[in-house]
């Protein structure tokens, strides 16, 4: 890397800041506008950690019903998530468990540390009220994700106890479901927080 004299260093450009300042100088930007631009820049620079949590039987991907779930393994999911996270400036922590209590513990960790979550609850989707209640305490974006489209499968899979506490659901795109979910998380992180009530 070539060292440039301080006078020749380019000015850093914050994401969205240039559009905010298009019609007026920086001194006239309101504090919320500056905060929003800095929040997005800090997210990219600091690599916000996203937990990508996977429920029961997802450790068997690649060998379990490949006609439904595809040939990709959990290692492939982790690699795709890491690559997408790198593109988005996010650090991705991919985990899998067959144990409901462990999954709930990870959700508590995310809430305590204000970490966004991409969650494939697998079979817990349909009946785990413990998971639902843990997710209701979330403090950061949450996107539910599924490799297959549950709505096209058995009737018992049509119910999700997770959907009502998630920001949204991505389903039916195989491995790409995770990539799309991470992009949704990045978008949610970049949005300004909702205005306080009256």
For the regions a protein language model found, what residue spans apply to each?
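Long, low-complexity intrinsically disordered regions
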Residues: 1-44
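Short glycine-rich anion-binding loops that position phosphate/pyrophosphate groups of nucleotides
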Residues: 56-58, 122-125, 148-150
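Glycine- and acidic-residue-enriched helix-capping/strand-helix junction motifs
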Residues: 61-75
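Short beta->alpha junction loops
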Residues: 91-101
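Short acidic/histidine-rich motifs immediately flanking catalytic phosphotransfer sites
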Residues: 110-117
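Short Gly/Thr/Asp-enriched flexible loops that form oxyanion-binding sites at enzyme active sites
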Residues: 128-137
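Short, acidic/small-residue loops that bind anionic groups at enzyme active sites
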Residues: 137-153
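Short, glycine-/small-residue-rich phosphate/pyrophosphate-handling segment
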Residues: 152-198
């Amino acid at each position: 890397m070539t060292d440039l004299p301080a006078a020749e260093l380019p000015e850093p450009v914050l994401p969205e800041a240039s559009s905010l300042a298009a019609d007026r100088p920086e001194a006239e930007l309101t504090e919320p506008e500056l905060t929003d631009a800095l929040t997005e820049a800090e997210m990219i620079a600091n690599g916000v950690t996203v937990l990508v949590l996977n429920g029961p039987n997802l450790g068997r991907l690649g060998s379990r019903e490949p006609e439904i779930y595809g040939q990709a393994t959990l290692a492939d999911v982790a690699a795709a998530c890491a690559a997408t996270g790198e593109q988005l400036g996010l650090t991705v922590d991919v985990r899998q468990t067959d144990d409901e209590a462990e999954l709930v513990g990870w959700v508590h960790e995310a809430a305590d540390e204000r970490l966004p979550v991409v969650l494939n609850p697998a079979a817990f989707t349909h009946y785990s009220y413990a998971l639902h209640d843990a997710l209701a305490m979330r403090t950061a974006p949450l996107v539910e994700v599924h490799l297959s489209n549950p709505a096209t499968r058995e009737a018992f899979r049509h119910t999700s106890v997770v959907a009502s506490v998630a920001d949204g659901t991505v389903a039916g795109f195989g491995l790409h479901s995770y990539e799309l979910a991470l992009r949704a998380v990045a978008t949610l992180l970049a949005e300004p927080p909702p205005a306080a009530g009256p």
